[in-house]
């Protein structure tokens, strides 16, 4: 069954421009307070100019282009401009450092990069020291370094016509994006997302929050994450609504932005809710038009009730991951909600709780949350150039193993129990314990290392490192944290260090993480 009517992203934007014309499609607010607005017609023209820019730089169907950007209009232009010519977006987490960014460049096979001046020195170093296929860089800032192979994105874009010059044949099965996501292995995996995936995500997420064309969907979530792209942007655009993209989250500014743009839908993670609750109470706390607050794990009942009562909102719980594209389990429009349930399986999906032998479990028993969808349509297609990893989580008949544990009740409501093995959830970011352990193990004074997540009142979990030193060595906290800051993204740097004589292990030699907190 073709739910999206065979419509790829190029056709979507041409149709949206025709149908909604001068209606506001996108509002972007920078951290400095600069606001840019685009109608559906204007946004489609900017997307076409960007597509033409890429074509003039030699980008063709199937080529990969990396984006290392904070939330900005250029991210939207590039995302859909690439899709219009059949090229593939590779978004890079804007918080990543040199080694991590270089690894994604190498393993995505990206040949062009769009970034800003603040990240340019890092990529200049990557070009000099790492083997990549990168042959050109576009900077979104006006000022340009005097280097070959570097262009001004804005200047080149503004020289292009507003009609598309290169329109190769497209299929909804074509890859639109490769999104690298943290896994339980030492390196992230590239989640392959098709035109169909993104079109379906728009319709599905719009259904989930009953979105209409008079809605305003505001998000502060980073554009390089799946939730911003599929739960927010694709939903808003698919419904002809207005999408408000704020560059960075500020607890002090958030409610003012909600009120200023008359937002009717927004999304929050627990860190946001906790930081909003510590702001001074205001008579304007409930002066807004919010109908739904899309919410993602994990919050206590007391925190949830206090937030909803103070701000006069209700939470729409949604559970998913990059591989599921959308929140495949969640609350439904017009349906009852059962906190702390994460909801019920959405349309086009099946969900089961399975035991260690991959057998379905009855209601009330804890096991692995498994989801059935259609690869490349309602769930991800595959991991890029990694068939072994794909086969490990995705069965031939479409059952996806999430690695998360939970249970369901007799009415089909699901409940989340625990995170995937060896993953830490920190302020909306997934952090791989194995990745951090491999980095820290390179320190010459460290013999053994394990990192775990511990409860944090603001950011869900903090990162704690337990280390065993080589005989005769000493290691100060200052030296340890400086090493971490130099070798990993800021959000991955542990908050706590404990030096031990040994680490607890079971009879097979595996570290017993539950004994370390």
Swiss-Prot record:
InterPro entries found in the cross-reference section = AMP-bd_C, AMP-bd_C_sf, AMP-binding_CS, AMP-dep_synth/lig_dom, ANL_N_sf, CaiC
Pathway given for this chain reads: Amine and polyamine metabolism; carnitine metabolism
The text of the family note is: Belongs to the ATP-dependent AMP-binding enzyme family.
Q: What class of enzyme is it?
A: ligase
Q: What reaction gets catalysed by this protein?
A: 4-(trimethylamino)butanoate + ATP + CoA = 4-(trimethylamino)butanoyl-CoA + AMP + diphosphate; crotonobetaine + ATP + CoA = crotonobetainyl-CoA + AMP + diphosphate; (R)-carnitine + ATP + CoA = (R)-carnitinyl-CoA + AMP + diphosphate
Task: List keywords of the entry alphabetically.
Answer: Ligase
Name this polypeptide is given: Crotonobetaine/carnitine--CoA ligase
Gene giving rise to this polypeptide = caiC
Q: What does this protein do?
A: Catalyzes the transfer of CoA to carnitine, generating the initial carnitinyl-CoA needed for the CaiB reaction cycle. Also has activity toward crotonobetaine and gamma-butyrobetaine.
Please name the GO terms that the record assigns under molecular function: carnitine-CoA ligase activity; crotonobetaine-CoA ligase activity; medium-chain fatty acid-CoA ligase activity
Q: Which cysteines are joined by disulfide bonds?
A: none
Identify the EC number(s). 6.2.1.48
Which Pfam families does its entry note? AMP-binding (PF00501), AMP-binding_C (PF13193)
What biological-process terms (Gene Ontology) are attached? carnitine metabolic process; fatty acid metabolic process
